Amino acid sequence: MLLRTAAASSLSLFNPNAEPSRSVPVLANNASRLVVRAAKGSTNHRALTGVIFEPFEEVKKELDLVPTVPQASLARQKYVDESEAAVNEQINVEYNVSYVYHALFAYFDRDNVALRGLAKFFKESSEEEREHAEKLMEYQNRRGGKVKLQSIVMPLSEFDHADKGDALHAMELALSLEKLTNEKLLHLHSVATKNGDVQLADFVESEFLGEQVESIKRISEYVAQLRRVGKGHGVWHFDQMLLHEGGHLA
């Protein structure tokens, strides 16, 4: 005997020719076991079978979004144009700062300046900023964006200052550049947050922001030390500290 649950919670004889008015389960007494099957037209198939994920059904929308033109990225997903542009801007920032630090390295490496510790510090700092730019380029490609390198401003070549001297003037410039870079990174993070891009936000937080704060703190201490020693013999001792103890930016 076959029974069907009615809408008013009453039981009636099963009519195989009748169309159910709503999705209802059907009880079938098959010899020694009770079988539950979906009634004709049932829309509650998942609840009856326990299936919560149907990959071949749900993937249809993603299949429609797969690019067919060779110029389009296959990896790109939930990566808006604003985020792509902001990453390219940050690449340009990192390269510009690297270029300035490289100019500072060349200045302090001159034979008539001969502050090898400061030269070493700024060379390592330049390499670090270039690595940051390359890391951003790799991320851009990973997300399916296009890297667009932009113009780099020609830096100064002379860094002596009549009142402060070259060492303090250069280190104050470095501190200002690190703070400016931090502002640019915070802007990139805000773009990611505004567009709900948690992957980009996490990338900026984990790879850049913490190190940037450490760099600002460290260079702030260098500025304070150089202000104490003035332009004289103390600069040579400071330079020797950088030369023998290291001190590149984070």
UniProtKB/Swiss-Prot annotation:
Transit peptide: 1-43
Domain of life: Eukaryota
Coiled-coil segments: none
Cellular component, GO annotation: chloroplast
Binding site for Fe cation 2: E129, E178, Q212
Entry binding sites for Fe cation 1: E94, E129, H132
InterPro entries: Ferritin (IPR001519), Ferritin-like (IPR012347), Ferritin-like_diiron (IPR009040), Ferritin-like_SF (IPR009078), Ferritin_CS (IPR014034), Ferritin_DPS_dom (IPR008331)
GO biological process, one term: iron ion transport
Keywords: Chloroplast, Iron, Iron storage, Metal-binding, Oxidoreductase, Plastid, Transit peptide
Region of interest (Extension peptide (EP)), residue spans: 44-76
GO molecular function, one term: ferroxidase activity
EC number: 1.16.3.1
Domain named Ferritin-like diiron: residues: 77-230
CDD domains with a match to the protein in the record: Euk_Ferritin
Subcellular location: Plastid, Chloroplast
Catalytic activity: 4 Fe(2+) + O2 + 4 H(+) = 4 Fe(3+) + 2 H2O
Role this protein plays: Stores iron in a soluble, non-toxic, readily available form. Important for iron homeostasis. Has ferroxidase activity. Iron is taken up in the ferrous form and deposited as ferric hydroxides after oxidation.
Family membership noted in the UniProt record: Belongs to the ferritin family.
Subunit structure comment from the entry: Oligomer of 24 subunits. There are two types of subunits: L (light) chain and H (heavy) chain. The major chain can be light or heavy, depending on the species and tissue type. The functional molecule forms a roughly spherical shell with a diameter of 12 nm and contains a central cavity into which the insoluble mineral iron core is deposited.
Official protein name in the record: Ferritin-2, chloroplastic
Gene behind this protein: PFE2
